[in-house]
Amino acid sequence: MARLKALFIALYPLAALLICAHALSLWWPDGHWLWLGVMLVNASILVPLGWLLIRGATRTGAHLSLATLCAWLGAALTLLGTLSLGDPRPLAWVYVGLGLLGWCVCLFRHDPLHSDTRHVGPKPGQPLPPLAFRDLEGRPVSTDALQGAPAVLLFFRGNWSPVCMARVRELMRRRPQLERRGARIVLVSAQPAARTARLARRLDAPLWWWVDPELASARQLRILDPGGTPLGLELFGHPRDTVLPTVLITDARGEIRYVDFVDDERRRPEPTTFLRVLDTMVPVPR
């Protein structure tokens, strides 16, 4: 199931882009607006992706209502177009059907691993177990270094995930407020150390950057996403397995006070949630 999901994530946007390009090439000489309907249906995934990549948004809404409306408007436009022509235009309906099917799968897909993780992963009130990582220089580090102060740990997939990258930038913007509450910000990467080091240099963020070699700590925390990397990225050096994007907040004693498993990448907590959790542990200096 995980590899099917990875295949879908890799191929669906590409297929939608190719369909839009072909529909545009057919509309240009044909001149009939039914092909605009085909493009509307298949642009339903391209527009949210563009929003994530260009605007750096960390969440796109629970139901992506506007994109869904565009998809169904596109289907209606295609129907009206074929009725006005008196020609069923089978290719147009194949493209519309593929677009609607892909969009519905995107909206309603459910990975059982994600819901199971809520029951077997770490929970508030538990001590954070000793976890081993590597820093950007390859030196061993562990969660023992976090004792004595609150910590916000973000386990993220890598720079190939636009939503994860937007979350990293969001934490960077909130860094003064988090550090004002005495919190250490730790970014734990599931991608190779060299890529993480380049990312840290590019962002120039004075945060704690750790790498999880072989995803051993992700396995220990039960936040591993086997086969979750989109198909094709392995050719560029990314591992086949990755993590479920997860936020842990611990107090100065190492007790877990907040956990967020992202079972749906379209729903992510606001950083103000982290601030409220920290406010219950450390008074904000005035």
Give the residues covered by each predicted segment.
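Membrane-anchoring/interfacial helices and their immediately flanking loops
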Residues: 1-52
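Transmembrane alpha-helical segments that serve as helix-helix packing and pore/cofactor-lining elements
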Residues: 47-69
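Transmembrane alpha-helices and immediately adjacent membrane-cytoplasm interface residues
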Residues: 66-118
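N-terminal "domain-start" segment that seeds a small globular fold
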Residues: 110-143
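Short active-site neighborhood of thiol/selenol oxidoreductases, capturing the structured segment around
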Residues: 142-171
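Hydrophobic beta-strand anchors of alpha/beta hydrolase catalytic cores
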Residues: 152-153, 185, 247
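Structural microenvironment flanking redox-active thiols in thiol-disulfide oxidoreductases
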Residues: 167-218
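Thiol-/selenol-based redox modules, centered on thioredoxin-like
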Residues: 237-286
